[in-house]
Amino acid sequence: VSKAFIGVNGIDGHNVTTANEEEGNGDAIILNNAIEKYIVADNSKFDSYSFYCFYRLDDLDAVITDDDISPKVKEKYQSYTNVL
């Protein structure tokens, strides 16, 4: 897979989280087999932790989000990966 795009339930610190272990394990397999790795999350997912942590932000190429993300939150998470 050249590029993978995964939706997530929460991003907290360097942790990428989802609602359940089965979904998280499947998403991790997809990301681990992609050359370029992206997650997609609207601004409400930042500083939010869901049930199962399945990936780390610093292992991703970027997080794709909406224009409503605050500059402070964007700056915080850009220390881990690109925030687009």
Cite the ranges covered by each PLM segment:
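Conserved phosphate- and dinucleotide-binding cores of soluble alpha/beta proteins
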Residues: 1-84
